Amino acid sequence: MKPAVKRLALAVPIALAVPGTALAQAYQCRVPDRIELPRPPRQDSTTVRAPVARYTLAVSWSPEFCRSQRGKAANDYQCSGKIGRFGFVLHGLWPEAAKGPSPQWCALEPRPSIEDIRTNLCMTPAPSLLEHEWAKHGSCMAVTPAGYFKVASILWNSLRLPDADKLSRREGLTAADLRREFVRRNPGFTESSVGLQVSNGGWLRELRLCYDKDFMPTPCPPRGFGPKGAVPLKIWRGL
């Protein structure tokens, strides 16, 4: 077991002590009886091995993703409605370096098992993405896919995510409004720990939640923090 997994195992009681923990962000997610392993992921950039200084938990707003990605085979579970209708889903957990390129593509083996995919499909409803996230990011912080997904799921299940549908109807919604609502629901965070990724048109794509190497919320680096303060924000409902 790598140090990252050990540290989070010790933090489990803290994570689960958060009041009102959300159990899932899927609408009636139903794991299919039969799941096929996707093709092995293709390494799309060079291997980087570097000390891990912090982590990013990337939480995707599924209606915005599916708005442009619906109809693609790799996104069928997430976007077709066959196994459920999704709001926020987990994109991935990424180890980050203090400076310079972050760790990536440390190993392509072992691959996630069918059981790994089945266990985590309602959290990340795309088998090919689960494969990719393990190979590109998880292999640099855990020995096995199961260990990596355990860390990610503990962080995921400790969150109380905002009611994005309700926020989307607020007139004059800003980036600060979303950050304040997230912090209200998750008192361990500050607004500086909540990065946002938006489209060129100002639509919410992802929350980028920042943790230190002990998996405690920490201020995000300026790069990638996203829109600040009173910058207008839009949220596509699509449900």
Task: Label the model's feature ranges.
Residues 25-66:
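N-terminal module-boundary/linker segments of secreted carbohydrate-active enzymes
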Residues 9-17:
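Bacterial N-terminal signal peptides
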Residues 1-10:
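Bacterial N-terminal signal peptides that target proteins for export
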Residues 71-239:
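Domain-level detector of nuclease and nuclease-like folds
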Residues 1, 17-18:
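Extended repeat- or IDR-based interaction platforms in eukaryotic proteins
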Residues 20-24:
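Sec/Tat signal peptide C-region and signal peptidase I cleavage site
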